[in-house]
Amino acid sequence: MSLSVTRENFDEWMVPVYVPAPLIPVRGEGSRLWDQQGKEYIDFAGGIAVNALGHAHPALREALNEQANRFWHTGNGYTNEPALRLAKKLIDATFAERVFFCNSGAEANEAALKLARKYAHDRVGNHKSGIVAFKNAFHGRTLFTVSAGGQPTYSQDFAPLPPDIRHAAYNDLNSASALIDDNTCAVIVEPVQGEGGVIPATKAFLQGLRELCDRHQALLIFDEVQTGVGRTGKLYAYMHYGVTPDILTTAKALGGGFPIGAMLTTQDYASVMTPGTHGTTYGGNPLATAVAGKVLDIINTPEMQNGVRQRHDAFIERLNTLNVRFGMFSEIRGLGLLLGCVLQTEFAGKAKLIAQEAAKAGVMVLIAGGDVVRFAPALNVSDEEIATGLDRFALACERLQTGGASCG
């Protein structure tokens, strides 16, 4: 007999680095989840932009089960067929010539930053070690990546932090230009700042960063952990901008819910990462890469990417209609199915409260700071699920506006 568990057990048994919602999901199908009490939710959170094809997608289950019946793990002393096939698919679909597999976005960004430092040290000298990142960015929770992220709340308790990391203002080329020089080895940037408020970069900003990196022989790293694998209506967001990075990191949606990350780069840059310079026990394991290969097969199609753009329009239209009714948002922004609703001044700081009320109404949404409600639904979310979910979201907005909302 299995152990009966409740939300209270989390507080008893788990390290308290999270504050999970009161509900515990137990089953999912498509863009719907059900909790222990059988209550249904429309999922517009997508596991924070992870569940790109929803829950329990039959093709992903089949790919996982097929590989699970063969073998699970060998370690990095051996390669495997699913990893090689996935690497080739990523290379064929992007600028990349070499791929490094890991287990998460933080690990992918860690690998990218290490590569950039090593390339600069090997080709120029140890003095070329500076990294320029951006305020309010998020690149992961390792000591290196949390230092690159421009949110002191996440890093201030872990000093001393890795040195030679400076932060410019996002979408401000003058601010970046003041920091990038001949001692800079890398610039790391999100094409859309996700945790920082769902803020798309301007084309001029990314083009300017590309030019600055070329001028100072610095590597341009695009963190596409949240924007990658179809989320913006193209396979990767850099394809919207006509700006090609030197290194790209990807994770989240790549596995459709199964943990995987990857760093993509060119042969020249990859060449400095010789045997023993970096590694991972589980990265590129056959279970993860088999599932990710199927995810790419489904998402990297014109039909799916056109569908994302159509669903973007449907969300924007309905959210604008909702905003006419409630007047809660000063701006609705984003790319594809990564959307942010910025709260008006009178509702400032209440994004979490709206998310809590939304869950009570039967729809899951995210926040991006205290003032932005974030949506990252499955890329194949249906018209009916969009309509039902946003009707439920409207109930949450109504409760907040009329003063009926309460914490907890």
Swiss-Prot record:
E.C. numbers: 2.6.1.81
Cofactor dependency: pyridoxal 5'-phosphate
MF (Gene Ontology): identical protein binding; pyridoxal phosphate binding; succinylornithine transaminase activity
Residues carrying N6-(pyridoxal phosphate)lysine: 252
Keyword Transferase: yes
GO biological process terms on file: alpha-amino acid biosynthetic process; arginine catabolic process to glutamate; arginine catabolic process to succinate; ornithine catabolic process
EC class: transferase
Gene3D superfamilies given in the database record: Aspartate Aminotransferase, domain 1, Type I PLP-dependent aspartate aminotransferase-like (Major domain)
InterPro entries cross-referenced by the UniProt entry: Ac/SucOrn_transaminase_bac, AcOrn/SuccOrn_fam, Aminotrans_3, Aminotrans_3_PPA_site, Class-III_PLP-dep_AT, PyrdxlP-dep_Trfase, PyrdxlP-dep_Trfase_major, PyrdxlP-dep_Trfase_small
Pathway annotation from the record: Amino-acid degradation; L-arginine degradation via AST pathway; L-glutamate and succinate from L-arginine: step 3/5
Reactions catalysed, as given in the entry: N(2)-succinyl-L-ornithine + 2-oxoglutarate = N-succinyl-L-glutamate 5-semialdehyde + L-glutamate
Ribonucleoprotein among keywords: no
SUPFAM superfamilies assigned: PLP-dependent transferases (SSF53383)
Record keywords: Aminotransferase, Arginine metabolism, Pyridoxal phosphate, Transferase
Top-level taxonomic group: Bacteria
Xref: CDD domains: OAT_like
Family: Belongs to the class-III pyridoxal-phosphate-dependent aminotransferase family. AstC subfamily.
Function of the protein: Catalyzes the transamination of N(2)-succinylornithine and alpha-ketoglutarate into N(2)-succinylglutamate semialdehyde and glutamate. Can also act as an acetylornithine aminotransferase.
Protein name, as recorded: Succinylornithine transaminase
Encoding gene, per UniProt annotation: astC
